[in-house]
Amino acid sequence: MSEIDTAVTVIGGYLGAGKTTLLNHILRTADERIAVLVNDFGDINIDEDLIASQDGDTISLANGCICCSLIDGFSSALATIRALEPQPQRLVIESSGVADPATVAAYGHGPGLTLDATVVVVDAETIRTKSRDVYVGDTIIGQLRSGDIVVMNKVDLVNDEDAQAIDEW
């Protein structure tokens, strides 16, 4: 097993924000060996199907949230990734749309791992409305606060003035 820690990047953000699109871009353009851990909240792991054609080792966790009900499975998946040969240089964790990225990122400090960044993806067209929603608003605000980097996606769907207002928000 390698003595160099595996860099960990967590991708979070609410449902439909563009997490899988960002992950696919990373996989297409990366010049390093990447392992991917995908967590979907429902019974069907849609995100895993969307990234299956990309290079890299992919482990999926379905029907629960990485940060609460799947802790044992998540720990087991991390052990599997750490045992891969050759060792991946980076682990990208795509958390479910309802997960708290900060909780998931805490695993990036485990043995043999170094947390690189927590990236939160937001949908420019819907972020302000969804952030005020009585059911999901607190989750979205919490996700935004936990990000080291916030990626505003779908900016082509809003005018320049709205994009600027969201950026300042």
Question: Residues of each region from the PLM?
Answer:
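Nucleotide-state-sensitive switch-loop elements of NTP-binding domains
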Residues: 2-12, 17-140
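Short secondary-structure transition/capping segments
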Residues: 85, 166-169
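G-domain G4 guanine-recognition motif of GTPases
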Residues: 122-125, 147-167
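Membrane-proximal helix-turn-helix segments that form the acceptor-binding/catalytic region
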Residues: 139-148
